[in-house]
Amino acid sequence: MNMEDKAGSYAIVIKALSKTFGTQMALRQLDLTVSWGDFLVIFGPNGAGKTTLVKILSTITSPTSGQVSIAGFDLKADYSSIRRNIGVVSHQPLLYQDLSVIENLRFHGRMFSVASLENRIKEVADLVGIQSILDRKTNILSHGTQKRVSIARAILHDPPIMLLDEPETGLDQEAVSVLSNAINQSERGQRTVLMVTHSLERGWALGDRIAILARGNIVYENTTTSLDQSALIETYNNLMGRL
């Protein structure tokens, strides 16, 4: 699927999105658009709503109110089409611990009817550096290695959109480079990425657009070409000091 074939100008459209848990409002009338091919990094402190946002976009959690469109599909109406168009890497790997690495990948691949599955597994395993551990049980792997497996699983069905929730947690610098390479290699062309993180330095280095989320809403947006890393850190600290 080429960029020009994709429905509309935006990969993700969020309008007036709110999410409450009891009396606590995690997201407040949030508006956001992500264009095809963007790498948007969202920063924010603990409790800002970052993980809640990714869970909603990943169809794990339902919004309380608002509208969300992903790859042209309405979140409330077409979960299955959205899931085919997204790959998710969370801060916890969320793998089947009683299965081997290759069994985890096969399960995911069959769920999405991945063509030439064994060849595709070899491709992604080579890409993220797990080709030597495919037969090992997941539960004996380190957190960082499990994270590599979760990256392989997320890109296995070659989704055009990646959703990353603190993906660098538990990864060394080499693995962060693997993550960056993996999410940017797609058979369909350039991937669209939405990543949430607390790491200003790594987020700035990876993204081309940045946003700051605080108290459940976007309070700042810019591009990494318009704002260098030191200016981002200063802007973030100033905003956090006022909120």
Feature map (PLM): residue ranges:
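Helix-to-loop junction immediately C-terminal to a conserved catalytic motif
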Residues: 58
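The feature captures the beta-strand-to-loop junction immediately N-terminal to the Walker
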Residues: 43-45
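Conserved ABC transporter NBD signature motif
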Residues: 66-74, 82, 220
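Conserved ABC ATPase signature
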Residues: 137-141
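Catalytic Walker B motif of ABC-type/P-loop ATPase nucleotide-binding domains
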Residues: 162-165
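Conserved ABC ATPase "signature" region
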Residues: 106, 110, 116-133
